[in-house]
Amino acid sequence: MSESVHTNTSLWSKGMKAVIVAQFLSAFGDNALLFATLALLKAQFYPEWSQPILQMVFVGAYILFAPFVGQVADSFAKGRVMMFANGLKLLGAASICFGINPFLGYTLVGVGAAAYSPAKYGILGELTTGSKLVKANGLMEASTIAAILLGSVAGGVLADWHVLVALAACALAYGGAVVANIYIPKLAAARPGQSWNLINMTRSFLNACTSLWRNGETRFSLVGTSLFWGAGVTLRFLLVLWVPVALGITDNATPTYLNAMVAIGIVVGAGAAAKLVTLETMSRCMPAGILIGVVVLIFSLQHELLPAYALLMLIGVMGGFFVVPLNALLQERGKKSVGAGNAIAVQNLGENSAMLLMLGIYSLAVMVGIPVVPIGIGFGALFALAITALWIWQRRH
Protein backbone atom coordinates (compact mmCIF):
# COMPACT_ATOMS: atom_id res chain seq x y z
CA MET A 1 0.00 0.00 0.00
CA SER A 2 1.51 3.29 -1.04
CA GLU A 3 1.83 6.28 1.25
CA SER A 4 -0.32 8.39 -1.04
CA VAL A 5 -3.16 5.95 -0.82
CA HIS A 6 -2.83 5.93 2.93
CA THR A 7 -2.72 9.65 3.61
CA ASN A 8 -4.48 11.50 0.82
CA THR A 9 -7.84 9.76 0.80
CA SER A 10 -10.76 12.06 1.54
CA LEU A 11 -12.97 11.37 4.53
CA TRP A 12 -15.90 11.13 2.11
CA SER A 13 -14.14 9.06 -0.53
CA LYS A 14 -15.98 6.30 -2.35
CA GLY A 15 -14.20 3.69 -0.24
CA MET A 16 -15.02 5.38 3.07
CA LYS A 17 -18.67 5.79 2.13
CA ALA A 18 -18.79 2.10 1.24
CA VAL A 19 -17.30 1.15 4.63
CA ILE A 20 -19.80 3.29 6.55
CA VAL A 21 -22.79 2.00 4.54
CA ALA A 22 -21.62 -1.59 4.93
CA GLN A 23 -21.16 -1.10 8.68
CA PHE A 24 -24.63 0.41 9.06
CA LEU A 25 -26.33 -2.40 7.13
CA SER A 26 -24.33 -5.13 8.87
CA ALA A 27 -25.01 -3.75 12.36
CA PHE A 28 -28.67 -3.14 11.42
CA GLY A 29 -28.95 -6.80 10.43
CA ASP A 30 -27.26 -7.96 13.66
CA ASN A 31 -29.66 -6.08 15.91
CA ALA A 32 -32.82 -6.76 13.89
CA LEU A 33 -31.96 -10.46 13.63
CA LEU A 34 -31.63 -10.84 17.39
CA PHE A 35 -35.18 -9.63 18.06
CA ALA A 36 -36.62 -11.35 14.98
CA THR A 37 -35.11 -14.67 16.07
CA LEU A 38 -36.32 -14.17 19.65
CA ALA A 39 -39.82 -13.69 18.21
CA LEU A 40 -39.36 -16.91 16.22
CA LEU A 41 -38.39 -18.80 19.39
CA LYS A 42 -41.49 -17.43 21.10
CA ALA A 43 -43.73 -18.38 18.15
CA GLN A 44 -42.29 -21.91 18.09
CA PHE A 45 -42.77 -22.29 21.87
CA TYR A 46 -39.14 -22.70 22.83
CA PRO A 47 -38.66 -22.48 26.64
CA GLU A 48 -37.89 -19.03 28.02
CA TRP A 49 -34.48 -20.11 29.31
CA SER A 50 -33.41 -20.84 25.71
CA GLN A 51 -33.53 -17.14 24.76
CA PRO A 52 -30.14 -16.18 26.24
CA ILE A 53 -28.67 -19.39 24.77
CA LEU A 54 -29.17 -17.71 21.38
CA GLN A 55 -26.74 -14.94 22.30
CA MET A 56 -24.41 -17.43 23.98
CA VAL A 57 -23.80 -19.33 20.72
CA PHE A 58 -23.13 -15.96 19.04
CA VAL A 59 -20.50 -14.83 21.55
CA GLY A 60 -19.12 -18.37 21.73
CA ALA A 61 -18.02 -17.94 18.11
CA TYR A 62 -16.21 -14.72 19.08
CA ILE A 63 -14.34 -16.54 21.85
CA LEU A 64 -13.47 -19.58 19.73
CA PHE A 65 -12.05 -17.54 16.85
CA ALA A 66 -10.49 -14.73 18.93
CA PRO A 67 -6.86 -15.90 18.46
CA PHE A 68 -7.18 -16.05 14.67
CA VAL A 69 -9.44 -13.30 13.31
CA GLY A 70 -6.89 -10.52 13.79
CA GLN A 71 -4.38 -12.31 11.58
CA VAL A 72 -7.09 -13.03 8.99
CA ALA A 73 -7.86 -9.30 8.82
CA ASP A 74 -4.17 -8.43 8.39
CA SER A 75 -3.35 -11.19 5.88
CA PHE A 76 -5.92 -10.26 3.23
CA ALA A 77 -7.47 -7.08 1.83
CA LYS A 78 -9.74 -5.95 4.66
CA GLY A 79 -12.60 -5.01 2.34
CA ARG A 80 -12.68 -8.59 1.06
CA VAL A 81 -12.56 -9.96 4.61
CA MET A 82 -15.57 -7.78 5.46
CA MET A 83 -17.40 -9.03 2.37
CA PHE A 84 -16.71 -12.67 3.29
CA ALA A 85 -17.84 -12.03 6.88
CA ASN A 86 -21.08 -10.39 5.75
CA GLY A 87 -21.59 -13.30 3.37
CA LEU A 88 -21.47 -15.66 6.36
CA LYS A 89 -24.02 -13.47 8.15
CA LEU A 90 -26.25 -13.56 5.06
CA LEU A 91 -25.98 -17.36 4.95
CA GLY A 92 -26.90 -17.61 8.64
CA ALA A 93 -29.93 -15.31 8.34
CA ALA A 94 -31.12 -17.06 5.17
CA SER A 95 -30.83 -20.47 6.82
CA ILE A 96 -33.11 -19.32 9.66
CA CYS A 97 -35.57 -17.99 7.04
CA PHE A 98 -35.66 -21.41 5.37
CA GLY A 99 -36.43 -23.28 8.58
CA ILE A 100 -32.98 -24.50 9.61
CA ASN A 101 -32.42 -24.62 13.38
CA PRO A 102 -32.24 -20.96 14.56
CA PHE A 103 -29.36 -21.68 16.94
CA LEU A 104 -27.27 -23.11 14.09
CA GLY A 105 -28.09 -20.16 11.83
CA TYR A 106 -27.29 -17.66 14.56
CA THR A 107 -23.95 -19.40 15.20
CA LEU A 108 -23.04 -18.77 11.55
CA VAL A 109 -23.88 -15.10 12.03
CA GLY A 110 -21.61 -15.09 15.11
CA VAL A 111 -18.71 -16.53 13.11
CA GLY A 112 -19.22 -13.79 10.51
CA ALA A 113 -19.34 -11.11 13.20
CA ALA A 114 -16.12 -12.41 14.78
CA ALA A 115 -14.30 -12.16 11.43
CA TYR A 116 -15.85 -8.77 10.65
CA SER A 117 -14.87 -6.91 13.83
CA PRO A 118 -11.06 -6.48 13.43
CA ALA A 119 -11.37 -5.82 9.69
CA LYS A 120 -13.92 -3.00 10.05
CA TYR A 121 -11.77 -1.06 12.52
CA GLY A 122 -8.45 -1.86 10.85
CA ILE A 123 -9.53 -0.62 7.41
CA LEU A 124 -10.15 2.92 8.67
CA GLY A 125 -6.42 3.43 9.22
CA GLU A 126 -5.77 2.25 5.66
CA LEU A 127 -8.30 4.61 4.06
CA THR A 128 -7.40 7.74 6.02
CA THR A 129 -5.05 9.01 8.73
CA GLY A 130 -4.36 11.75 11.30
CA SER A 131 -7.28 13.97 12.30
CA LYS A 132 -9.37 12.36 9.57
CA LEU A 133 -8.91 9.00 11.29
CA VAL A 134 -10.49 10.34 14.48
CA LYS A 135 -13.44 11.65 12.44
CA ALA A 136 -13.67 8.34 10.57
CA ASN A 137 -13.95 6.50 13.89
CA GLY A 138 -16.67 8.94 14.88
CA LEU A 139 -18.58 8.20 11.67
CA MET A 140 -18.20 4.46 12.30
CA GLU A 141 -19.56 4.77 15.85
CA ALA A 142 -22.40 7.05 14.72
CA SER A 143 -23.46 4.59 12.02
CA THR A 144 -23.29 1.76 14.56
CA ILE A 145 -25.46 3.55 17.11
CA ALA A 146 -27.99 4.46 14.40
CA ALA A 147 -28.04 0.83 13.27
CA ILE A 148 -28.56 -0.41 16.84
CA LEU A 149 -31.50 1.95 17.33
CA LEU A 150 -33.18 1.35 13.98
CA GLY A 151 -32.31 -2.35 13.72
CA SER A 152 -33.59 -3.25 17.18
CA VAL A 153 -36.88 -1.43 16.65
CA ALA A 154 -37.31 -2.75 13.10
CA GLY A 155 -36.73 -6.32 14.26
CA GLY A 156 -39.41 -6.09 16.92
CA VAL A 157 -41.96 -4.14 14.86
CA LEU A 158 -41.63 -6.36 11.78
CA ALA A 159 -41.79 -9.50 13.94
CA ASP A 160 -45.12 -8.31 15.37
CA TRP A 161 -46.37 -8.08 11.78
CA HIS A 162 -44.83 -11.34 10.52
CA VAL A 163 -41.74 -13.16 11.80
CA LEU A 164 -40.71 -14.34 8.33
CA VAL A 165 -40.84 -10.76 7.00
CA ALA A 166 -38.55 -9.65 9.84
CA LEU A 167 -36.07 -12.45 9.10
CA ALA A 168 -36.13 -11.69 5.37
CA ALA A 169 -35.41 -8.00 6.10
CA CYS A 170 -32.32 -9.07 8.06
CA ALA A 171 -31.10 -11.19 5.15
CA LEU A 172 -31.64 -8.25 2.79
CA ALA A 173 -29.63 -5.97 5.09
CA TYR A 174 -26.71 -8.41 5.05
CA GLY A 175 -27.03 -8.72 1.28
CA GLY A 176 -26.84 -4.94 0.99
CA ALA A 177 -23.71 -4.95 3.18
CA VAL A 178 -22.07 -7.49 0.85
CA VAL A 179 -22.85 -5.26 -2.14
CA ALA A 180 -21.47 -2.19 -0.34
CA ASN A 181 -18.25 -4.10 0.42
CA ILE A 182 -17.67 -4.55 -3.32
CA TYR A 183 -17.13 -0.78 -3.61
CA ILE A 184 -14.32 -0.74 -1.02
CA PRO A 185 -11.00 -0.43 -2.90
CA LYS A 186 -8.86 -3.56 -2.77
CA LEU A 187 -5.95 -2.30 -0.69
CA ALA A 188 -2.83 -4.38 -0.07
CA ALA A 189 -2.83 -6.73 2.90
CA ALA A 190 -1.31 -5.12 5.99
CA ARG A 191 0.85 -8.13 6.96
CA PRO A 192 0.87 -10.75 4.19
CA GLY A 193 2.78 -14.01 4.37
CA GLN A 194 2.30 -14.68 8.09
CA SER A 195 2.54 -18.20 9.46
CA TRP A 196 -0.77 -20.05 9.77
CA ASN A 197 0.45 -22.41 12.47
CA LEU A 198 -2.57 -22.50 14.78
CA ILE A 199 -0.48 -23.37 17.84
CA ASN A 200 1.84 -20.41 17.29
CA MET A 201 -1.11 -18.09 16.60
CA THR A 202 -2.79 -19.20 19.82
CA ARG A 203 0.46 -18.84 21.79
CA SER A 204 0.98 -15.31 20.43
CA PHE A 205 -2.56 -14.34 21.37
CA LEU A 206 -2.18 -15.77 24.88
CA ASN A 207 1.07 -13.81 25.29
CA ALA A 208 -0.84 -10.61 24.47
CA CYS A 209 -3.52 -11.58 27.02
CA THR A 210 -0.84 -12.19 29.67
CA SER A 211 0.93 -8.90 28.94
CA LEU A 212 -2.26 -6.85 29.28
CA TRP A 213 -3.38 -8.72 32.38
CA ARG A 214 -0.07 -8.12 34.19
CA ASN A 215 -0.37 -4.35 33.69
CA GLY A 216 -2.55 -2.87 36.43
CA GLU A 217 -4.15 -0.18 34.26
CA THR A 218 -5.03 -2.44 31.34
CA ARG A 219 -6.30 -5.15 33.71
CA PHE A 220 -8.53 -2.56 35.37
CA SER A 221 -9.87 -1.48 31.96
CA LEU A 222 -10.42 -5.05 30.75
CA VAL A 223 -12.39 -6.01 33.86
CA GLY A 224 -14.48 -2.83 33.78
CA THR A 225 -15.44 -3.01 30.10
CA SER A 226 -16.10 -6.76 30.34
CA LEU A 227 -18.44 -6.28 33.29
CA PHE A 228 -20.25 -3.48 31.48
CA TRP A 229 -20.87 -5.27 28.19
CA GLY A 230 -21.68 -8.54 29.92
CA ALA A 231 -24.30 -6.72 31.96
CA GLY A 232 -25.55 -4.81 28.92
CA VAL A 233 -26.33 -7.88 26.85
CA THR A 234 -27.93 -9.60 29.86
CA LEU A 235 -30.18 -6.55 30.37
CA ARG A 236 -31.36 -6.92 26.75
CA PHE A 237 -32.69 -10.39 27.49
CA LEU A 238 -34.00 -9.44 30.91
CA LEU A 239 -36.21 -6.83 29.23
CA VAL A 240 -37.78 -9.44 26.92
CA LEU A 241 -39.15 -11.34 29.94
CA TRP A 242 -39.62 -8.31 32.21
CA VAL A 243 -41.95 -6.33 29.91
CA PRO A 244 -44.90 -8.79 29.91
CA VAL A 245 -44.57 -9.47 33.66
CA ALA A 246 -44.07 -5.90 34.93
CA LEU A 247 -45.95 -3.90 32.29
CA GLY A 248 -48.47 -6.47 31.01
CA ILE A 249 -47.39 -5.83 27.39
CA THR A 250 -46.89 -8.94 25.26
CA ASP A 251 -45.77 -7.57 21.87
CA ASN A 252 -42.26 -7.89 20.42
CA ALA A 253 -41.78 -4.17 19.79
CA THR A 254 -41.86 -2.76 23.34
CA PRO A 255 -38.61 -4.43 24.52
CA THR A 256 -36.89 -3.02 21.43
CA TYR A 257 -38.13 0.51 22.21
CA LEU A 258 -36.78 0.14 25.76
CA ASN A 259 -33.43 -1.11 24.45
CA ALA A 260 -33.30 1.91 22.14
CA MET A 261 -33.52 4.22 25.16
CA VAL A 262 -30.36 2.63 26.57
CA ALA A 263 -28.53 3.21 23.26
CA ILE A 264 -29.60 6.88 23.18
CA GLY A 265 -28.41 7.30 26.75
CA ILE A 266 -25.01 5.77 25.91
CA VAL A 267 -24.50 8.42 23.21
CA VAL A 268 -25.24 11.20 25.73
CA GLY A 269 -23.02 9.66 28.39
CA ALA A 270 -20.17 9.11 25.94
CA GLY A 271 -20.31 12.78 24.94
CA ALA A 272 -20.22 13.87 28.58
CA ALA A 273 -17.26 11.59 29.30
CA ALA A 274 -15.32 13.04 26.37
CA LYS A 275 -15.64 16.50 27.94
CA LEU A 276 -15.28 15.66 31.64
CA VAL A 277 -12.93 12.66 31.92
CA THR A 278 -9.29 12.26 30.86
CA LEU A 279 -6.82 9.40 31.33
CA GLU A 280 -5.50 11.29 34.37
CA THR A 281 -8.99 11.68 35.92
CA MET A 282 -10.19 8.14 35.21
CA SER A 283 -11.69 7.69 38.69
CA ARG A 284 -14.45 10.17 37.78
CA CYS A 285 -16.18 7.48 35.72
CA MET A 286 -16.42 4.91 38.53
CA PRO A 287 -19.43 6.32 40.44
CA ALA A 288 -21.40 6.13 37.19
CA GLY A 289 -20.61 2.42 36.98
CA ILE A 290 -21.91 1.83 40.49
CA LEU A 291 -25.06 3.84 39.73
CA ILE A 292 -25.81 1.58 36.73
CA GLY A 293 -26.45 -1.28 39.14
CA VAL A 294 -28.47 0.89 41.53
CA VAL A 295 -30.71 2.20 38.72
CA VAL A 296 -31.20 -1.33 37.31
CA LEU A 297 -32.43 -2.38 40.76
CA ILE A 298 -34.89 0.54 40.88
CA PHE A 299 -35.97 -0.10 37.28
CA SER A 300 -36.82 -3.73 38.05
CA LEU A 301 -39.50 -2.57 40.50
CA GLN A 302 -41.36 -0.34 38.00
CA HIS A 303 -44.84 -1.07 36.63
CA GLU A 304 -45.35 1.96 34.37
CA LEU A 305 -43.94 2.52 30.89
CA LEU A 306 -42.80 6.17 31.16
CA PRO A 307 -40.64 5.69 34.29
CA ALA A 308 -39.17 2.60 32.62
CA TYR A 309 -38.16 4.66 29.57
CA ALA A 310 -36.59 7.36 31.76
CA LEU A 311 -34.66 4.93 33.95
CA LEU A 312 -33.31 2.99 30.97
CA MET A 313 -32.08 6.20 29.36
CA LEU A 314 -30.39 7.05 32.67
CA ILE A 315 -28.76 3.60 32.69
CA GLY A 316 -27.46 4.33 29.19
CA VAL A 317 -26.09 7.75 30.19
CA MET A 318 -24.26 6.23 33.15
CA GLY A 319 -23.03 3.40 30.93
CA GLY A 320 -21.59 5.72 28.27
CA PHE A 321 -19.90 7.87 30.92
CA PHE A 322 -18.41 4.74 32.51
CA VAL A 323 -17.21 2.69 29.56
CA VAL A 324 -15.79 5.29 27.12
CA PRO A 325 -12.87 6.36 29.37
CA LEU A 326 -12.06 2.70 30.09
CA ASN A 327 -11.93 1.99 26.35
CA ALA A 328 -9.61 4.96 25.82
CA LEU A 329 -7.32 3.78 28.62
CA LEU A 330 -7.02 0.29 27.11
CA GLN A 331 -6.38 1.61 23.60
CA GLU A 332 -3.68 4.01 24.79
CA ARG A 333 -1.84 1.59 27.10
CA GLY A 334 -2.45 -1.44 24.87
CA LYS A 335 -1.03 0.31 21.79
CA LYS A 336 2.26 0.80 23.62
CA SER A 337 2.53 -2.77 24.92
CA VAL A 338 0.98 -5.33 22.53
CA GLY A 339 -0.34 -3.15 19.68
CA ALA A 340 -3.82 -1.74 19.14
CA GLY A 341 -5.08 -4.73 17.15
CA ASN A 342 -4.04 -7.25 19.79
CA ALA A 343 -5.49 -5.06 22.54
CA ILE A 344 -8.87 -4.96 20.75
CA ALA A 345 -8.78 -8.74 20.22
CA VAL A 346 -8.04 -9.36 23.91
CA GLN A 347 -10.77 -6.91 24.90
CA ASN A 348 -13.23 -8.73 22.64
CA LEU A 349 -12.30 -12.01 24.33
CA GLY A 350 -12.82 -10.55 27.80
CA GLU A 351 -16.12 -8.90 26.96
CA ASN A 352 -17.54 -11.94 25.20
CA SER A 353 -16.40 -14.25 28.00
CA ALA A 354 -18.22 -12.01 30.48
CA MET A 355 -21.32 -12.08 28.26
CA LEU A 356 -21.17 -15.87 28.10
CA LEU A 357 -20.82 -16.17 31.88
CA MET A 358 -23.57 -13.66 32.74
CA LEU A 359 -25.99 -15.02 30.15
CA GLY A 360 -25.34 -18.53 31.45
CA ILE A 361 -26.15 -17.48 35.02
CA TYR A 362 -29.26 -15.62 33.81
CA SER A 363 -30.44 -18.59 31.75
CA LEU A 364 -29.93 -20.89 34.75
CA ALA A 365 -31.91 -18.52 36.99
CA VAL A 366 -34.82 -18.53 34.51
CA MET A 367 -34.58 -22.31 34.09
CA VAL A 368 -34.94 -22.98 37.84
CA GLY A 369 -37.99 -20.70 37.99
CA ILE A 370 -36.76 -17.53 39.70
CA PRO A 371 -39.21 -14.70 38.80
CA VAL A 372 -37.82 -12.04 36.48
CA VAL A 373 -38.28 -9.10 38.91
CA PRO A 374 -36.11 -10.67 41.66
CA ILE A 375 -33.58 -11.59 38.96
CA GLY A 376 -33.44 -7.91 37.95
CA ILE A 377 -33.03 -6.77 41.56
CA GLY A 378 -30.23 -9.26 42.21
CA PHE A 379 -28.58 -8.43 38.90
CA GLY A 380 -28.50 -4.70 39.69
CA ALA A 381 -27.22 -5.22 43.23
CA LEU A 382 -24.45 -7.61 42.15
CA PHE A 383 -23.31 -5.26 39.37
CA ALA A 384 -23.11 -2.31 41.77
CA LEU A 385 -21.08 -4.40 44.23
CA ALA A 386 -18.75 -5.64 41.46
CA ILE A 387 -17.95 -2.12 40.24
CA THR A 388 -17.48 -0.94 43.84
CA ALA A 389 -14.97 -3.76 44.40
CA LEU A 390 -13.19 -2.85 41.14
CA TRP A 391 -12.95 0.81 42.21
CA ILE A 392 -11.54 -0.12 45.62
CA TRP A 393 -8.99 -2.41 43.96
CA GLN A 394 -8.00 0.33 41.50
CA ARG A 395 -7.47 2.89 44.28
CA ARG A 396 -5.26 0.47 46.22
CA HIS A 397 -3.09 -0.33 43.19
Curated annotation (Swiss-Prot):
It comes from the Bacteria. Catalyzes the facilitated diffusion of 2-acyl-glycero-3-phosphoethanolamine (2-acyl-GPE) into the cell. One of its GO terms (cellular component) is plasma membrane. The keyword Transmembrane applies. The gene is lplT. Residues 1-17, 74-90, 166, 248-256, 302-304, 365-366 are periplasmic. This is Lysophospholipid transporter LplT. SUPFAM superfamilies: MFS general substrate transporter. The keyword Membrane applies. Keywords: Cell inner membrane, Cell membrane, Lipid transport, Membrane, Transmembrane, Transmembrane helix, Transport. InterPro entries: LysoPLipid__transptr_LplT, MFS, MFS_trans_sf. Residues 39-52, 112-144, 188-226, 278-280, 326-343, 388-397 are cytoplasmic. One of its GO terms (molecular function) is lysophospholipid:sodium symporter activity. It is a multi-pass membrane protein.
